[in-house]
Amino acid sequence: MNNMKTFKFLTALFVTSILTACTMDAERPVNVQYIDKTDSTWQQHLQKIQKIQSYQAKGQIGYISPTERFSSRFEWQYQNPKSYTLKLYSLISKSTLWIQMHQSGMTISDNNGNQQSAANAKLLLQEIIGMDVPLEHLAYWLKGQPAMNADYQVGTNHLLGAFTYHVDGSQWTADYLTYHSNNSMPENILLKNDSTKQTLKIRVDEWIY
């Protein structure tokens, strides 16, 4: 079944099925202390994560927008800007969605055999799932690497504390709430876009790189 209406209906069922009772703290932290970007420990860490070209991350993601609200387990596999996969799977059922980026564009498929492809990844993501999240930037945001032209802050833990970044005319902010103690990789991240009223809360349980 590759009928678009059927696929969107099944996708809606998937999104509904992964709604959870857990609450999402969507407010940015306040009164946070930061240190200078020239901090030597931060600069060493930045060089380390810049060398991580391909990686995997597993955890849980929560998303809120004016039209969608869901929580899901996720698996993220990133090779390069033209090759990455985001797998979303339900917390309470067998429903699964695959979002795959490839040379010719993006393909979104589910465990029922439905799929849809398009050259414009942004529009496909909006049409099928209702998300307007720049996945091409998420690859760097997830591992705590600020963009070259981003306005960012370094926390007292000598790791990325927060950043502000403009994408397609709107502003995204990120707050890195906690890090894993064993590898200094992000654990809890809060992403917000006030102009589009989107909130993305990510908890990374496992890093592979």
Predicted regions and their residues:
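C-terminal motif of bacterial Sec signal peptides marking the signal peptidase cleavage site
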Residues: 18-21
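An acidic-aromatic
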Residues: 83-131
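Beta-strand-dominated lipid-handling architectures at cellular/organellar boundaries
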Residues: 58, 69-71, 77, 82, ...
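Bacterial signal peptide processing site
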Residues: 23-26
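A short, Trp-centered hydrophobic/proline-enriched beta-strand micro-motif
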Residues: 45-67
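Flexible, processing/modification-adjacent segments and terminal tails
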Residues: 111-166, 170
